[in-house]
């Protein structure tokens, strides 16, 4: 948090929105390029954060050109076409319980005292997104560090039960909750 994309969703004022991070259509600005070069040089993970689909595609394209090898993309609100395009760059997709939980219906604070609702997704769409991304490219998380949800480990347990009900195998779930994270972060 905080990007122009999210600030616009939250209905923030224009003065606030202008100060937020974004990736221009022409490509990342000089400061962002410097950060991408540092990430590449140190072989650390780039988390693209809460950007729009087009911003994420642009950022990932530039990151790969600069040698960034490990990219984590929060993808709960993307469509199948965006997931398909991002797969070409060999990113890891993150899907979290938060975006299908009741927390999306409750105004919450994130970066300041203002309360806003977050755009979520539904379980059917989530299942299709994970299928498109493919379990070997997915990390599941609870993202449950808000007071209206159960403790993160309990939320994660609930999320895993939902994923099991989607029909993913134990092997696929093992990739999504353990193996992919270990590989991405060299653990």
State what each model feature region is:
Residues 1-80:
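Divalent metal-binding pocket/active-site signature
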Residues 36-40, 64, 83-90, 127-135:
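Acidic (Asp/Glu)-rich catalytic clusters
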Residues 46, 93, 143, 173, ...:
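Divalent metal-coordination and catalytic microenvironments
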Residues 57-61, 82-86, 103-126, 146-160:
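Histidine/acidic-residue-rich catalytic or RNA/ligand-binding cores of hydrolases
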Residues 65-69, 133-134, 165-170:
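Short helix-capping segments at alpha-helix termini
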Residues 92-104:
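His/Asp/Glu-enriched short active-site or ligand-binding loop at hydrolase and phosphoryl-transfer sites
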Residues 135-151:
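Short acidic/histidine-rich active-site segments
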Residues 153-187:
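Mid-to-C-terminal alpha-helical segments outside catalytic/metal-binding sites
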């Amino acid at each position: 948090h905080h990007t122009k994309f999210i600030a616009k969703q939250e209905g923030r004022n224009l003065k606030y929105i202008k100060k937020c991070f974004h990736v221009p259509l022409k490509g990342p600005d000089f400061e962002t390029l410097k950060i991408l070069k540092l990430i590449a040089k140190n072989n650390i993970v780039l988390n693209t954060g809460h950007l729009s689909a087009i911003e994420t595609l642009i950022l990932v394209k530039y990151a790969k050109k600069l040698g960034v090898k490990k990219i984590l993309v929060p993808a709960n609100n993307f469509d199948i076409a965006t997931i398909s395009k991002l797969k070409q760059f060999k990113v890891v997709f993150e899907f979290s319980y938060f975006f299908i939980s009741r927390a999306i219906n409750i105004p919450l604070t994130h970066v300041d005292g203002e309360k806003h609702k977050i755009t979520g997704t539904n379980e059917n769409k989530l299942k299709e997104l994970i299928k498109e991304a493919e379990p070997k490219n997915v990390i599941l998380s609870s993202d449950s560090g808000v007071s209206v949800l159960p403790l993160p480990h309990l939320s994660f347990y609930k999320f895993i039960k939902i994923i099991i009900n989607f029909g993913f195998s134990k092997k696929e779930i093992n990739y999504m909750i353990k193996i992919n994270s270990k590989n991405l972060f060299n653990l």
